[in-house]
Amino acid sequence: MMKRQELMELEDEKLIWACVEPVIQKVRGRSGLEKLQVFRKLGDGQRALFMFQVLHGHMEHGINGFYDQVSYLAEQMNIWSALKSGMRYLGFDAMIDLIGKMEDDYARKADGRADNAAAEELDDIYRNLIPSAIRGVADRIRSHPEDFLPGED
């Protein structure tokens, strides 16, 4: 594991990944119940960071790709509530609003009422918000490293 000072000097996205990767390694390939157990053991900061990475990592292929990837989480936990809670902890009100709109769009899609224009708009909003969100998360990690840095098991 890197030393704290080395972590703090990383570029923003690399810093976020270095802090969240140990959690991702713990849940990768596990059952939904096992993932939920790991999630519940995290501190508030680590939980928020994990949810940020769930959003950011799964949005790589757009909103519909995100929906496809997280549908399994919706079965095990209230993914929408967890995402909003994470963004609230990180202080990203605009992301909370976006997640609420995503939740509504996801429900419409699940009911067979997909709205491609709405999905494209949500993609655009996300792309506009994510650069400042990444900076904000990295700044928060640097300001309060004890809340986010991986601990020893």
Regions of interest found by a model, annotated:
Residues 1-79, 86-153:
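Extended, alpha-helix-rich binding/interface surfaces that flank or overlap catalytic cores
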